Amino acid sequence: MERAAVRKKIQMVFQDPYSSLNPKRTIEWTLEEPLKSCTKLGKKERKQKVQEILKIVGLDESYGQRYPGELSGGQRQRVSIAAALILDPEFVIADESVSALDVSVQAQILNLLQKLQKEKGLTYLFISHDLNVVQYMSDEIGVMYLGHLVELGDAQEVCSHPAHPYTKALLSAIPEVEGVRKERIVLEGEVPSPANVPEGCPFHTRCKEAQERCRKEYPAPRKVKEGHVVCCHNVAKV
């Protein structure tokens, strides 16, 4: 498949709406540029497409004549989403796409992403350090540590019954709901350099359950339940 065709099918929403948009170009220019590069639409059709996509993400067509510096963080991220959707992709990578926004604005953007997913049949790869956000947005969750996938499964299953020690520690750090008490798991030691990942299980230097085998042998994926896989020597196979 040619690169141009792949670009049309796969798009990305970046983390920082303050740096992902060209401050010297209008919003209309930013949204129209991909249409010039990847479609054969005429000028009138491109303008119409830009107006339509702005409306879809909740912005008036007048925003097309504005510059990024004239917009709020939430408005900029809506423009970033519009830029990702302007070519009608099938797959969208959202890389920490709400972490730079205020909490109230985060909720608006997440709801918008869900709405667009249902309307357009999109598939998202949603990257985030916030497990509350991940659980809200995802059907499946993959937990990574130092570039290695350590647990994968249904979102509700992983969050309700985590199997990997790292996943358990992450979930224990989520603030408690009133009346619900849980033990906080505090990880000790420093995070190793991703350029020099430890031999064996990459998590063994911070894991309280680590054994000699963990220090020497990388754990193969183990099925703990249908659709739930973990890479840990200390988890029993199903």
Feature map (PLM): residue ranges:
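A short, proline-enriched helix->beta-strand linker immediately N-terminal to the Walker B motif
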Residues: I86-E90
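P-loop NTP-binding/switch modules centered on Walker-like glycine-rich loops
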Residues: S97, L101, V105-K182
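Short helical segment in ABC ATPase nucleotide-binding domains corresponding to the A-loop/adjacent helical element
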Residues: Y18, K24-S37, K47, Q51, ...
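Short catalytic/signature loops enriched in Gly
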Residues: R3, D154-V238
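Conserved ABC ATPase signature
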Residues: Y67-L71, Q75
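Catalytic Walker B motif of ABC-type/P-loop ATPase nucleotide-binding domains
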Residues: V92-D95
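Conserved ABC ATPase "signature" region
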Residues: K44-S62, L171-S172
